[in-house]
A protein has these predicted regions:
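Short alpha-helical segments that sit at the start of domains
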Residues: 2-34
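Short, cationic-aromatic polyanion-contact patches
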Residues: 18, 76-100
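Short acidic, hydrophobic short linear motifs in intrinsically disordered regions
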Residues: 35-45
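Short, positively charged loop/turn segments that connect secondary-structure elements
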Residues: 45-59
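Short, hydrophobic-biased segments on the C-terminal half of alpha helices
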Residues: 59-66
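A short, conserved structural fragment
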Residues: 66-77
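Amphipathic alpha-helical dimerization/coiled-coil segments
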Residues: 93-127
């Protein structure tokens, strides 16, 4: 087997140093719906391994995911201090990434009938 980068089926958003936090943000927004960064931090902080996560880290990750078109701003909400903060939600790209990360493609290929396989091929064919 040749050396080099692993050609696994993992998506780039779920690879690397920030992968765990990306997954936590995606799952929280998928379960709780659109939220500002502070509410995201409160929910993520309840998860195992994220108790000491800081606001600035989550905010920077959310802004990076917004630039990559995985999150989008859907409004603003007034904070207790009186300022306004954006509310974020998942884009269809992020929802697809979550669905693909939960799908085992090997088992899909083995269990799918020809109609499902043909439909998947048509979807994945480049234009």
């Amino acid at each position: 087997m040749a050396k080099g980068k692993d050609k696994s089926g993992r998506l780039s958003v779920f690879k690397g140093h920030e992968a765990r936090l990306n997954k936590a943000i995606f799952h929280t927004l998928a379960l709780k719906g659109p939220q500002p960064v502070y509410a995201l931090l409160k929910e993520i902080g309840k998860q195992r391994g994220f108790a000491d996560t800081r606001y600035g880290v989550v905010r920077r990750r959310v802004e990076a995911l917004e630039k990559q078109d995985y999150l989008m701003r859907v409004g603003v909400v007034k904070t207790h201090v009186g300022s306004y903060t954006p509310v974020y939600q998942l884009t269809p790209r992020a929802e697809l990434a979550l669905a693909l990360s939960k799908t085992n493609l090997d088992s899909f290929i083995k269990k799918a009938d020809y109609a499902q396989i043909i439909k998947m091929l048509e979807t994945l064919k480049p234009c």
